[in-house]
A protein has these predicted regions:
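Solvent-exposed interaction patches of small proteins and small membrane subunits
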Residues: 1-91
Length: 91
């Protein structure tokens, strides 16, 4: 699986998200206004969604392409459909 995505890019994004979530946790302790906390939650959610896009793009560029060219196209399409369904349920 690692070869089908830009692992360095993904790790960098995930570390940023971890920092955002830790900041949100501190905001709760510091009694920051709810609107500001919600804004930061939305930012972290958007960043996590972008991580999903990175994984899905890698899946398309590598796994799907390879599966269609060298494997079973029907199985590849089924796998791709499942990946898209899982990603679309992240919202």
């Amino acid at each position: 699986m690692r070869q089908c995505m830009d692992a360095d890019n993904l790790h960098r994004r995930l570390k940023k998200i971890i920092g955002q979530v830790q900041a949100i946790d501190r905001m709760v302790d510091e009694d920051v206004p709810c609107e500001d906390v919600l804004s930061q939650i939305n930012a972290a959610k958007s960043a996590l969604n972008k991580c999903g896009q990175v994984v899905l793009e890698g899946h398309i560029q590598h796994c799907v392409r390879d599966g269609i060219q060298h494997g079973d196209a029907d199985k590849t399409i089924e796998s791709f459909t499942k990946a898209v369904e899982r990603f679309s349920n992240m919202g």
